[in-house]
Amino acid sequence: GVQTCALPILKAGRNQDAWRLNTPCENIVIRHCDILKGHTLLGIGSEMSGGVRNVYMHNCTAPDSVFRLFFAKTNHRRGGFIENIWMKNVKAGKMQRVLEVDTDVLYQWRDLVPTYQDSITFINGLYMDSVTCDRTEAVYDLKGDARLPIKNVEIRNVTVGEVTKFVKNVVNAENVVEENIIYKEKQDKQ
């Protein structure tokens, strides 16, 4: 388990090396972690070709400012899997996204290095429950790959003080369940 740390980021190797080793990052409990400022409270990837599964994060905070509370990122070169990831009882300040999954993260490598082999990441079972934050641009943003959509996402009991751009965006995702998402939309000043 991981506890009382400041930056929980889970990785599981990149491309051929990770596929050859076949050693997933798995069975991890993350609790009582506080991140003051940074990119993400719980980050998975993009180096996750060996797979990440069975992660339970609970009772953590991001009181100031982060880009995302929970961010899973991969691309069509990575392969591997992301499955059975839980985030529960989290309190946060302001951010861009409460939950984001992006399956097309290549940054500068998109044009610098050619794709020799497509290997789509299997993403199944992402669960978020009892999350409170002050302000976000969006509650959740799920961008799956059409060839292997994201499956089984549950977002429950999320309270946001203010949403400034949009509540949700879902592309290539199946069985997305939301329950009891409470938010206030940004009011334009007259």
List the model feature ranges, each with a label:
Residues 90, 94-99:
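Catalytic cores of secreted or luminal carbohydrate-active enzymes
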Residues 9-14, 19, 36, 40-45, 121, 138-147, 165, 170, ...:
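Leucine-rich repeat
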Residues 9, 41-43, 69-71, 98-100, ...:
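Structural detector of coil-to-beta-strand junctions
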Residues 15-33, 48-62, 75-91, 108-132, ...:
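Surface-exposed loop/turn motifs in large extracellular/passenger domains
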Residues 1-7:
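Short, small-residue-biased leader/transition segments that mark boundaries at the very start
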